[in-house]
Regions:
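C-terminal output helix
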Residues: 88-90, 107-117, 163
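Basic, Lys/Arg-enriched C-terminal extension of HTH/homeodomain DNA-binding domains
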Residues: 176-198
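Conserved acidic segment of CheY-like receiver
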Residues: 2-17, 21-25, 38, 53-56, ...
Length: 198
């Protein structure tokens, strides 16, 4: 049984390091996909799904920071943890400023890395959920968005109708459309799905 909440990837140009890191993480119960360069990773992985990548900083052709930038430009929810054999404090600070969740110097302590991976996977799943909610909200009309905001604030239908200068029936139709488009059946499910992005 894998302990992965979402896919775990390692990108490192040093094959012995790649293999030993994968072996160590598999011994902790993870299922791991490995790549020896950034291009192979980009061609193989769906950047719009949750995941965690352990990324070497210094690789030929495409450095880890370049790969991370490409992922950020794609709005990827995949969490990044840097691993390097040649790190320093300024490099770590820059990586964290760029959105990496953690930075480890090789050789790395397995327990510390596992804790960071578990945290990164949870963060990635939350990021994917937020992105999914934002995309779903884009399908709403302007008026449906207005009604949604008022619903999330806890306003009653008649009060919404008065505030938006429309009939009660119009509010009920918009509210029903919002529920259908967001694929929820209750107010609690609606708030859970989009309350954090409004």
């Amino acid at each position: 049984m894998s302990r992965n909440l979402c896919p775990l990837y390692i990108v490192d140009d040093e094959v012995p390091v790649l293999e030993s890191m994968a072996f160590m993480l598999e011994s902790y119960g993870y299922s791991v996909d490995v790549y020896s360069n950034g291009q192979d990773f980009l061609q193989s992985v769906n950047l719009h799904q949750a995941g965690c990548v352990l990324l070497d900083c210094r690789m030929p052709e495409m450095r880890g920071q370049e790969l991370h930038l490409l992922m950020r430009n794609q709005c990827s929810p995949i969490s990044v943890i840097y691993l390097t054999g040649h790190g320093d404090i300024p490099m770590a600070v820059d990586a964290l400023k760029e959105g990496a969740l953690d930075f480890f110097q090789k050789p790395v302590d397995g327990n510390a890395l596992v804790a960071a991976i578990d945290n990164a996977m949870e963060c990635s799943l939350k990021n994917q959920e937020k992105q999914s909610a934002k995309l779903t909200l884009q399908s709403l009309t302007r008026r449906e968005k207005e009604v949604l905001i008022l619903v999330v604030k806890g306003m009653k239908n008649q009060d919404m109708a008065n505030q938006l200068c429309v009939s009660l029936r119009t509010i009920e139709v918009h509210r029903s459309n919002v529920m259908k488009k967001l694929e929820v059946e209750s107010l609690a499910a609606l708030i859970h799905k989009v309350g954090h992005v409004i």
